[in-house]
């Protein structure tokens, strides 16, 4: 395993990229109409409180909580806790537990431990630019799902005590599942690619979200850490 594989995994937590079985109940037209309404509401709200879980096969699981804004670029701060997996102990040693990920319009910044900083010239924060091809915000994911050829309604389910309608469709190499409440608000989103799964629960739409930019002298680029630069 590469020396910094656990660092790569931890830094990926903030990307916010399982699913359950089901077959199409209704046509794509009805599904797309509901998803368009949900996307309009997400865009209008501009922010929300989030509770996200990430699973990377058997290697690592984590939970991230906080608030994110997408009204003018992505901004917000998440507290990240490692919850299990084969790399849990070593990830905690390098990344700290809890750690923190800050989202700013240009990139996400992940706080690492003093042990990590000793290996990186005293720098604690990893700066990772966004993949512009990815689904960075809930509105992006809903847009991708609206455009999916196989988008469909799976059925009705309960999400943390709220009755919701479940929709699913393919996106790139994986698929997206979303759950909308009775008012067509997004309450849960799951994205699955290979053995990488992220599930995000949303509440408190319109909640304040902010992030402070780490000092440049305390920041190292992701490409430098992984040797990709």
What are these regions (language model features)?
Residues 120-159, 215-217, 228:
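Solvent-exposed helix/loop surface patches that form functional interfaces
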Residues 162-218:
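Gly/Pro-enriched, hydrophobic low-complexity segments
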Residues 44-51, 73-77, 88, 160-168, ...:
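Short, hydrophobic/aromatic-rich segments at coil-to-beta transitions
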Residues 52-56, 79-83, 111-114, 190-194, ...:
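Beta-turn initiation residues at beta-strand->coil junctions
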